[in-house]
Amino acid sequence: DTTRLLLNYYGLKIRFGQDPENQLCTDDFAGHWAHNANLSIKAIMGVAGYSEIARILGLNSVAERYADIAKKMAMKWEEMANEGNHYRLAFDRENTWSQKYNMIWDKMWDLNLFPNNVIDKEVSYYLTKQNLYGLPLDSRKEYTKSDWIMWTAAMSPDLETFKKFIDPLYKYINETTSRVPISDWHHTDSGEWVGFKARSVIGGYWMKVLADKMLN
């Protein structure tokens, strides 16, 4: 039945999600990297999401169990990814960074799973890595995914910080010489598109609207 299927699914998340092996993810443009920290966050938030589903269904003991597992996974994540003033792209890769956009769900669900102000630390670090036309996806290349920038920006503590991420993105859309419908994959230094155009992922641009609706 559905419950058994979900239990098996989240059992796999707990077993393999903390420190992912060489798995596919949406940020593989520069190649596959095992131990992907953002992919690990996705698994952790999945476990937390299962806890929330159980809570809504009145399965309080199940909710508490999986909430505790997610909390412990998040604490371990913080230790594994810690690079001092930011967190790594992959657990075993020193001097790397990446957008941890999957962490937006921790903020939106008001769970506070990740300790030591992880979100605020990451957001502050990202602001030091921005180029003329936006924040790169990670430390490997200068290109970005603008839908993920919008998710990342939605983690900002206030509107002023949010706008610091949005202004370069607006500049890209307004000034790019690539005459295609909005591309969600572009170079942050030149403002030219890499690929993709007019895709449904542009819906991710409305993450701030969703976050405000859920939190207010």
Segments (PLM) and residue ranges:
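Extended ligand-binding clefts on enzyme/binding-domain cores
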Residues: 36-41, 72-165, 171, 175-180, ...
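Aromatic-lined, polymer-binding surfaces characteristic
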Residues: 2-57, 63-66, 74, 80-84, ...
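Structural helix-adjacent loops and short alpha-helical linkers that scaffold large soluble proteins
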Residues: 1-7, 51-71, 109-124, 156-167, ...
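Terminal, non-catalytic domain-edge segments
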Residues: 168, 183-184, 188-216
